[in-house]
């Protein structure tokens, strides 16, 4: 059994017991969140178009740093900037 979950403008395949890195959620560590499921595939192969996924927030963290480099030739113009995108690690508990 699995579900396709949409959160933060992206879609993820959620299965019970699986850890997912999603865009940062406004929930504290240890809290339970409900995410809307776009479609749910049951064990018998049946496909449902609605459902919910209950998940627990494990931790909040940031991804590895990416570097953004701007450069203009012949003008001695260079800029280096770094960015770390925040994410939330959740554990899927059940699909309803």
UniProtKB/Swiss-Prot annotation:
Print the keywords alphabetically: Ribonucleoprotein, Ribosomal protein, RNA-binding, rRNA-binding
Q: Which is one Pfam family of this protein? A: Ribosomal_L21p
GO terms, molecular function = rRNA binding; structural constituent of ribosome
Task: Please list the coiled coil stretches.
Answer: none
Instruction: Please give the biological process terms from Gene Ontology that the record holds.
Output: translation
Q: Which family does it belong to?
A: Belongs to the bacterial ribosomal protein bL21 family.
Q: State the protein's name.
A: Large ribosomal subunit protein bL21
């Amino acid at each position: 059994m699995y579900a396709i979950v949409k959160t933060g403008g992206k879609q993820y395949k959620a299965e019970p017991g699986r850890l997912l890195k999603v865009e940062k959620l406004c929930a504290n560590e240890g809290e339970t969140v409900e995410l809307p499921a776009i479609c749910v595939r049951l064990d018998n192969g049946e496909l449902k178009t609605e459902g919910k996924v209950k998940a627990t927030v494990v931790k909040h963290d940031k991804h590895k740093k990416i570097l953004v480099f701007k450069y203009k030739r012949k003008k001695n113009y260079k800029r280096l900037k770094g960015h770390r995108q925040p994410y939330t690690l959740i554990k899927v508990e059940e699909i309803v």
